[in-house]
Amino acid sequence: MNHNTNEEKTEHPTEHRIRKFRKKGKTRYSRELSSLFILLVGFINLWWYRDLIVLNFSKIMSDSFLFESNDFLNNNNNLLKILMSLKEILFSFFPFLISLLIVIIIPPILFSGISLNFRSLTLNFSKLNPFHGFKRLFSFQIIVEFFKIILKLFIVSIISFWYLQFSFSEILFLVNANYVSSLSHGYNIIFSCCFLVILGLFPIVFFDIAWQQFNYYKKLKMTRQEMRDELKEKEGNPNIKMRIRQAMKAVMRRRMIINTPKADVIITNPIHYSVALKYDEKNMNAPKVIAKGIGEAAIKIQNLALKHNISIISVPSLARSLYRYSEIGQYIPGPLYKAVAEVLAWVWKVRKWKKEGGIFPEKPINISVPSELTFTGEHETND
């Protein structure tokens, strides 16, 4: 089928298309929002653990500036001091790192759900094509991403420069203060600067959320041709469905040809319906339908019955009900036992007549079918 690649995407996406996008790992999740969460958690940790961090760094500096004569003679002491300092640094930042690890994992799950996508790990040679890469380089998506990076650099630089200039006198004070005061004041300066930078990044995050939402639904939108293709995919190609029906009918014909010669009697409409019944007193609990058909198939069943000398009886109401309420290979419904028993009694009389001769048994008349199983019939035709 030829698809018009220039066809405009005007149709709203279906649930099926949204699920396909999610399977491919395509979601509307904003990376800028994730980055903001990481910065916020880092900022909260800087505030929450400020006393612990300042205390541990003060201790590290205090230990670093104390010298003993043994330290110069024993290298192991120096190594031990370095290791202890590293331990203090890790201890200070351990809660900070754990919380960052959690916030890196949780937001994507909250906003996009758990989606394991291994397709991105497969080798795609089209991505190695320099021509395609060059086209992507100048796509609108890349231009927007580049604009966001430049804007972030600009905002962070402007805010940091302005705040450092504003706090210049405090920064100079750190030079003359003792190391504990320097650490505490320096920590507060960094903390305040981070707070202002995070506030400055909020507009970019809001823009990115809106952009990702717009871009996601733009990609999800479908052309009319895609809608038709999806409908075919869901409901099945009509040509394939027709071939399946033809194959099923062919199987039914073969079963009919095999099973009909085994029947005890054929109950007919007589033109529109034919039902072949088999009953073995020793091995069956009730009569069983072994073949049935309407239209042309019904005529074929009757012809096969004549060829194999099987009794045929015309009971239209019973034939219709058996066809409607019985399946091939299954026992007949209980309410039809009495009507079928009358037919089978006539069949056995016919068999006795064939062996012994005499007067041909009279066919049963006025065979009644229960009202709940009465079926007027739909005169279809089978190919």
UniProtKB/Swiss-Prot annotation:
<feature type="transmembrane region" description="Helical">
    <location>
        <begin position="35"/>
        <end position="55"/>
    </location>
</feature>
<keyword id="KW-1005">Bacterial flagellum biogenesis</keyword>
<dbReference type="InterPro" id="IPR029025">
    <property type="entry name" value="T3SS_substrate_exporter_C"/>
</dbReference>
<keyword id="KW-1133">Transmembrane helix</keyword>
<comment type="similarity">
    <text>Belongs to the type III secretion exporter family.</text>
</comment>
<dbReference type="GO" id="GO:0005886">
    <property type="term" value="C:plasma membrane"/>
</dbReference>
<comment type="function">
    <text>Required for formation of the rod structure in the basal body of the flagellar apparatus. Together with FliI and FliH, may constitute the export apparatus of flagellin.</text>
</comment>
<feature type="transmembrane region" description="Helical">
    <location>
        <begin position="189"/>
        <end position="209"/>
    </location>
</feature>
<keyword id="KW-0812">Transmembrane</keyword>
<dbReference type="GO" id="GO:0044780">
    <property type="term" value="P:bacterial-type flagellum assembly"/>
</dbReference>
<protein>
    <recommendedName>
        <fullName>Flagellar biosynthetic protein FlhB</fullName>
    </recommendedName>
</protein>
<keyword id="KW-0472">Membrane</keyword>
<dbReference type="Pfam" id="PF01312">
    <property type="entry name" value="Bac_export_2"/>
</dbReference>
<dbReference type="InterPro" id="IPR006135">
    <property type="entry name" value="T3SS_substrate_exporter"/>
</dbReference>
<keyword id="KW-1006">Bacterial flagellum protein export</keyword>
<keyword id="KW-1003">Cell membrane</keyword>
<feature type="transmembrane region" description="Helical">
    <location>
        <begin position="142"/>
        <end position="162"/>
    </location>
</feature>
<feature type="transmembrane region" description="Helical">
    <location>
        <begin position="89"/>
        <end position="109"/>
    </location>
</feature>
<keyword id="KW-0813">Transport</keyword>
<keyword id="KW-0653">Protein transport</keyword>
<dbReference type="InterPro" id="IPR006136">
    <property type="entry name" value="FlhB"/>
</dbReference>
<dbReference type="GO" id="GO:0009306">
    <property type="term" value="P:protein secretion"/>
</dbReference>
